[in-house]
């Protein structure tokens, strides 16, 4: 497992521990999701949920200091994510990878 993968796993663990079911999904998108990232690439994630952005950025900063990897989160509230259908959302839905979900499926 590479450093980026370890950093991302730890980020998800900390977000889940801090915010719990307030986070519905964490979706990886961008170059890392497509597999065309390089050493300088950041890790793009979309977080669908009700989270305090300052607290989230504290986690991002801790990961950067501990792993040397920059995670770039975008946060959307669930109702906003459900309504938006712009090119960004379409790209995330088509190329993104759901890394975490608290949504139960039947």
Where are these regions (language model features)?
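Catalytic core of pol beta-like nucleotidyltransferases
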Residues: 1-25, 34-39, 48-106
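Conserved H-loop
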Residues: 31
């Amino acid at each position: 497992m590479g450093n980026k993968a370890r950093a991302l796993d730890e980020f998800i663990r900390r977000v889940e521990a801090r915010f719990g079911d307030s986070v519905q999904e964490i979706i990886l998108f961008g170059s890392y999701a497509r597999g065309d990232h390089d050493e300088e690439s950041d890790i793009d994630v979309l977080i669908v949920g009700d989270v305090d952005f300052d607290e989230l950025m504290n986690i991002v900063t801790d990961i950067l200091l501990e792993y040397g990897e920059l995670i770039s989160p975008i946060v959307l509230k669930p109702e906003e994510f459900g309504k938006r259908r712009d090119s960004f959302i379409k790209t995330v839905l088509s190329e993104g990878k759901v890394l975490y979900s608290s949504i139960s499926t039947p």
